[in-house]
Amino acid sequence: MTPERIQRLTRVLDKRQNDLTVVLENVYDPHNISAVMRTADAVGIQEISVLNTRIGPHKKWGAKSSSSAAKWLTVKQYSDPGSCFADLRRNYDLILTTHLSTEAVSLYDIDFTKSIALVFGNEHDGVSEEIRNMADGNFIIPQVGIIRSLNISVA
């Protein structure tokens, strides 16, 4: 590895946000997961958790969507919500799920000085009630259009 490559990797690692993570619950399409990985890498999130209670663990991500981001991230896969949340509780102060409710806070009002896990649901049903009940609260991504939801790959 060249000295320039080592220097670039060191710079990137120094800017990683180890106090912010993303959790994806039952996301069916591996290309959507890969798109989230690419975004996470771009904004400096190091760790992603993939929780699958309805489908088996993903063996392969959509390579074109992630642009190989998966190899630079720590990706944890879970099949049990309890195990996933036990790990999240050990490492993060606050766990919030995306869910449109009267109690949901705006993404812009979240105190990101705390360590936070943001949970996103699947393409069809969003975050399950079971996972919402395990979390500390809900948040929304404010929108001004008619459609009140975003695809997981862009949220």
Give each language-model segment a name.
Residues 1-154:
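Post-transcriptional modification and biogenesis factors for structured RNAs
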